Amino acid sequence: MIDLLPDILSHLTQLDAPVRTLYPADFTQLPCIVLTETANDVFARADGAPHLHEVEYTLESWASALSQTHALAAKLDEKLSALGFSRTYCCDLFDAATRAHRRVMRYRALCDEHRIITQ
């Protein structure tokens, strides 16, 4: 199984918000970014062994204002696109209980057994 999470995390360290792999426990510490792997499948085989892997990651930008989520999302999109990922989904949500805005985005890529991303 291919794990690109460390590579993605290393490219997101320069952002203006902490990147987490779990949902915020404290919604007073916003903005933040949540990164989760949502798919990791064998896309193609060669000589009976996995050759291409399809990976999908969901990134959520959380903030107290919609404008903050959009600004973070633009930076995230730039970073993930530079890595070779394609955005497949984007949606704005509002959590009334926490009064927090979030933008959910999904990114997909194909990579080989050497973790080289292709399109």
Mark where each language-model region is.
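Mid-chain, well-packed structural core segment of small domains
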Residues: H53, T58-F85
